[in-house]
Regions:
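Surface-exposed alpha-helical segments enriched in charged/polar residues
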Residues: 35-39, 71, 166, 200, ...
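Accessory, non-catalytic peripheral segments of nucleic-acid enzymes
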Residues: 255-417
């Protein structure tokens, strides 16, 4: 029996929120998964199906994080087999990458197809001396085959890979192929995903376990296609995805993949506050605070965990939406929730009011109607819209007649009493 751990989309060095603590979360997740589901379970090997790193160019501290994790596996004599993803593939015009660096130093084995244009076979066996190869036959009875990041050329590459896998020498009974691409229908707003039928040549070529990466959501199809999802959430939406690492066992009865999710992850909490057209700025602030306070009271949000929190405020308001100081509100709510990152999504609409106006209406009537519509839409002025709109017309005439500013201010004070 063989046992292995399938990881993908680790994204060490994630820095989207400009938070050093959030960047460390991705390291802590990987380290914990390795301890719990690779070392403690004594797997035969670990596979990484792309995007170990968030960026092609990484900082020394991020490289050190990867080395610390892989040194744990080295000490346990567990090999790591990896491929490049779209985030960490070899930059155009160069011949090296940080994954190749780790491979050359024996931290992992980067399984890459050969350069056919240079006369190399698509798949050569792993050469431990030169730290190079496209596939490896392991003593546990599994053949692991690598691939590259193909992007839009994935369908064409699948045909080439399938033919090359068929032509490989006879080897272990089980073949695992690492492939960084997504399957159609698994996630919205993702173009270029592969159809199931387009992957079938790999199954027909003898691939028993297609280890996917790229989409950050867990899925499996047909009993042979497996995608664990990312270890950590890359955005608040992914906080609600089923994600993790596959602990896989291969025995005489077949393949058994168990998704593991119990490891170090920072909680992501999404909240909603609904407004109505009669709400003032103070009302909106109170509703926002209430949404956070209720989440704390019900245990949805635990301040001590320093979660990532998103509060979406939506609906209509009875004031100009830009009058609300959202920066101060975000700061206050972050302090209240003790969130590491607090994202305030202020997506309200101002109440609109418009009286029908005849096409032949005079300019004076149009102006009066515009003032009245604006005042009617404001919660503080709508009951006096008729009086105030007349006052604004008078104010315009007074300005045009040349009255000074002091007189105009005095007129406004009396109008608003």
């Amino acid at each position: 029996m063989a046992r292995f751990l399938h990881l993908a989309d680790i994204h060490l060095g994630f820095d989207r929120y400009n938070s050093p603590e959030r960047t460390k979360d991705f390291f802590f997740a990987l380290s914990d998964v390795i301890q719990k589901y690779a070392i403690a379970t004594k797997v035969d090997f670990v596979i990484i199906a792309g995007d170990l790193f968030e960026h092609r160019v990484i900082q020394p501290a991020i490289l050190n994080q990867a080395q610390l994790c892989f040194q744990q596996l080295q000490a346990a004599h567990i090999p790591v087999l990896a491929i490049e993803g779209n985030h960490d593939n070899t930059p155009y015009g160069t011949s090296t990458s940080w994954l190749k660096y780790l491979s050359q130093w024996g931290m992992l084995k980067l399984l890459e197809p050969g350069n056919i244009a240079a006369g190399e076979p698509l798949y050569a066996p792993w050469d431990e001396v030169n730290k190079k190869g496209g596939y490896i036959d392991l003593a546990c009875g599994v053949r692991v085959v690598g691939s590259a990041w193909y992007g839009a050329a994935a369908v064409r590459a699948i045909g080439q890979i399938a033919e090359a896998v068929k032509a490989l020498p006879t080897g272990p009974d089980t073949t695992v192929l690492l492939f960084h691409h997504g399957l159609e229908g698994q996630i919205a707003r993702y173009s270029g995903a592969l159809r199931y039928s387009e992957l079938m040549p790999l199954k027909e070529a003898g691939v028993d376990y297609l280890a996917l990466g790229h989409i950050h959501k867990n899925y499996c199809e047909g009993g042979w296609i497996f995608n664990p999802g990312s270890l950590e959430a890359n955005n608040v939406e992914e906080g609600g995805f089923t994600r993790g690492a596959y602990l896989v066992e291969v025995d005489a009865e077949g393949i058994h993949a168990d998704l593991k999710q119990d490891y170090c992850q920072r909680p992501v909490v999404r909240l909603l506050a609904k407004t109505q057209d009669s709400d003032s700025e103070a009302d909106v602030v109170a509703k926002a605070r209430q949404a956070v306070e209720v989440a704390i009271a019900t245990g949805q949000l635990v301040p001590e965990q320093q979660s990532i929190v998103e509060l979406r405020i939506e609906g209509q308001v009875g004031f100009a939406r830009l009058e609300l100081d959202t920066k101060q509100l975000q700061k206050d709510l972050q302090a209240l929730s003790q969130a590491l990152i607090f994202l305030l999504k202020y997506e309200v609409e101002e109440k609109e009011f418009a009286e029908p106006i005849a096409s032949e209406a005079s300019r004076d009537l149009i102006e009066r109607s515009a003032f009245k519509d604006m005042l009617t839409a404001h919660r503080d002025y709508k009951k006096r819209a008729d009086t105030l709109s007349e006052g604004l017309i008078d104010l315009k005439h007074k300005r045009l007649s040349g009255q000074d500013d002091e007189a105009l201010y005095h007129y406004l004070e009396e109008l608003l009493v």
